[in-house]
Amino acid sequence: MSNVDSEESPQETTCEAVVLDFLAHGRSDDDRPQYQKDPLAYALGVEDFRLFECTVDGDATVAIGDRLVVDPPADRSPEVVSVRAVEHGDLSGGAQSELEYVVEDVVEAQEDRFVEFYLEAQPVTLRLHQLNLLPGIGDKLQEGILDERRRGRFESFEDVEERVAGLHDAKGVIVDRIMQELTEDDLKYRVFARGE
């Protein structure tokens, strides 16, 4: 767990995050009296799928699905007081159950970005291709995707599914891989979710 406040990036791009859960009375495992607890929001970064715990201004109202700017500190949404990066196990139960739905919404909203992955995926090692990192994609499907992308660009997930025999849920495969990267700490390769 690191403080996002202390990280400075050379290029000041804003990091937008979708709220997964809002705890108006803070964490339940916090033993302080209720009036001393700060409201918290758990959020998922839209670009790099980082998980955040945001301390929220006591007067602000935040709902699940709201979008907040969490980084850099100068550009933060007014309701966000502080932000820290967290791991999947640190999320509240509500945030954990909401996570897959939000990931699916992000993938759907940025379909071009993820279809581009099918077009741009490269070998990781001599024996392993980025496409093989996706759940359910073995050598046969990998070859099918590579053959079809040589013939022409994929326009959408539907186009990928129509042209590649055996690949029935192009979006679901991406969502499953992102969920693996968010929930499993011991993955050697990360394609979508930035590791801390």
Residue ranges of model-derived segments:
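Structure-specific DNA junction-binding interface
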Residues: M1-V106
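Short, Lys/Arg-enriched anionic-surface-contact patches
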Residues: V106, P135-G136
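A short alpha-helix capping/helix-coil boundary motif
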Residues: V107-E111
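C-terminal extensions
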Residues: D112-L133, E143-E196
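Small-residue hinge/turn detector
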Residues: G138-L141
